[in-house]
Amino acid sequence: MKFKSQKIAFNFFAFSMLLLFLQIVYGYIMGFARIGMDGLHEWIPFNVARATHTNLLVVWLLSGFMGAAYYIIPEEGDREIEWPWLAQIQFWSLGVVAVSAVIGFHFFYWEGRKFLEIPRELDYLVVINVLCFIANIGVTL
């Protein structure tokens, strides 16, 4: 790595791999439930597994994209990320969103709309997160 700020990307990549693993686990849970082997149905109903599975996909893709940008942009711009502290805050807030959403799904705290299940408060945090990302990358370029 040429720049110290590229180490921020590792957090995003590691988080993406964890979420991908969890998404695969929830996919297996749904697959087994589909063929009638739903021993976990009392603890993880199918609708909760589907909501979690779908939202994990969105978050790990978002995290992976942000990590890739934080790795590539310093090399392309030949300079450090302008606000590495903002990238760290952004990483932790994305983690809070992901964990809160998954826990919320298991306690039936969601909006109930198809593919837009996370609560409105977390939607706002995701928007703020993406705006911080755009600002950080824009200032760096």
Each model region followed by its residue ranges:
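Cytosolic juxtamembrane amphipathic/interface segments immediately preceding
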Residues: 1-8
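Short secondary-structure boundary micro-motifs
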Residues: 3, 31-34, 116
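Hydrophobic cores of alpha-helical transmembrane segments in multi-pass integral membrane proteins
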Residues: 10-35, 46-77, 84-108, 121-140
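Solvent-exposed, non-transmembrane regions of integral membrane proteins
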Residues: 40-44
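Inter-helical loop and helix-membrane interface segments of multi-pass membrane transporters/permeases
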Residues: 109-119
